């Protein structure tokens, strides 16, 4: 594997499939990905365009805070993660089920 492929797979971790992401995909042509915690909007845009061969319009990224959880009366927390909402240009699409 060359270094550019490693960088792409280092930025994009996995697609996030949920009711909200499915609805956004159908209505607004927006796809949701879990990305690396140090990934920028430009990194995500370049990775999606090169991996799926599509044109990206807008990228929005946000940090999801980890939840506090308890297990057998011991406190703990889940780690936080970063996700990206990627809007494609009209006429473009990604088959998320095949890419998983």
From Swiss-Prot:
One function term, GO molecular function aspect: structural constituent of ribosome
Record-level GO cellular component terms: ribonucleoprotein complex; ribosome
Keyword Ribosomal protein found: yes
Assembly information from the UniProt record: Part of the 50S ribosomal subunit. Contacts protein L29, and trigger factor when it is bound to the ribosome.
Taxonomic lineage of the native organism: Bacteria, Pseudomonadati, Pseudomonadota, Gammaproteobacteria, Lysobacterales
Coiled coil: none
GO biological process: translation
The entry's keywords: Ribonucleoprotein, Ribosomal protein, RNA-binding, rRNA-binding
Organism: Xylella fastidiosa (strain M12)
Recorded name of the encoding gene: rplW
Its biological purpose: One of the early assembly proteins it binds 23S rRNA. One of the proteins that surrounds the polypeptide exit tunnel on the outside of the ribosome. Forms the main docking site for trigger factor binding to the ribosome.
S-S bonds: none
Leader sequence segment: none
Protein name listed in UniProt: Large ribosomal subunit protein uL23
UniProt record similarity statement: Belongs to the universal ribosomal protein uL23 family.
């Amino acid at each position: 594997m060359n270094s550019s492929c490693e960088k792409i797979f280092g930025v994009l971790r996995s697609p996030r499939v949920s009711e909200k992401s499915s609805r956004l995909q159908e209505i607004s042509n927006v796809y949701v990905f879990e990305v690396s915690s140090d990934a920028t909007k430009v990194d995500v845009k370049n990775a999606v365009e090169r991996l799926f061969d599509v044109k990206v319009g807008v990228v929005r990224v946000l940090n999801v805070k980890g939840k506090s959880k308890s297990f057998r009366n011991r406190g703990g927390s889940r780690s936080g993660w970063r996700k990206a909402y990627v809007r494609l240009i009209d006429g473009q699409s990604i088959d998320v089920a095949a890419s998983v």
